Amino acid sequence: MVFPSPLQGVDIRHNKDRKVRRKEPKSQDIYLRLLVKLYRFLARRTNSTFNQVVLKRLFMSRTNRPPLSLSRMIRKMKLPGREGKTAVVVGTITDDVRVQEVPKLKVCALRVSSRARSRILKAGGKILTFDQLALDSPKGCGTVLLSGPRKGREVYRHFGKAPGTPHSHTKPYVRSKGRKFERARGRRASRGYKN
């Protein structure tokens, strides 16, 4: 019978060793990969954090690159000190029909929806691609980095404290919104209690 020697070590748990972050985009889109190649170079060769942030955002998933509406972009570009600067969005710019007048804007984005594109250009604005931006301002001077609301997706309404617990405003997953479905106990004072 062989006894374990007292000098044996304990096996180290390696499951937490890896840093979980993207080093490249999941997408196989060749145009996106060319942009990654370009901004990898710029992030390495320039001392600007702008290029590093753009590179990191190019790696992100679609849910982490939410679309930015025209109205939100106009509102953000109206803030003091942002006149004449280029709005940079690593994602899509979408139209907002609630906006009546579009000011003259200089914009750089991965994609611009057709109606948003026509409205920006009609107002005398300019739309750049990221390779044009790299030539225009390689260090990100005169730019404003914007992004859409990441928690704007409907699914975020279901996250948080369990629905039905006190002070919870979490949306329950219900098969139907009828009178008989999660509308009585806990929802009105006459039926037990009201949250």
Swiss-Prot record:
Record keywords: Cytoplasm, Endoplasmic reticulum, Isopeptide bond, Phosphoprotein, Ribonucleoprotein, Ribosomal protein, Ubl conjugation
Coiled-coil blocks: none
Subcellular location: Cytoplasm, Cytosol; Cytoplasm; Rough endoplasmic reticulum
Residues annotated with Phosphothreonine modification: T165
Residue ranges, annotated region (Disordered): 158-195
Quaternary organization: Component of the large ribosomal subunit.
Record function comment: Component of the large ribosomal subunit.
Membership in a protein family: Belongs to the eukaryotic ribosomal protein eL18 family.
Protein name listed in UniProt: Large ribosomal subunit protein eL18
Naturally occurring in which organism (per UniProt): Sus scrofa (Pig)
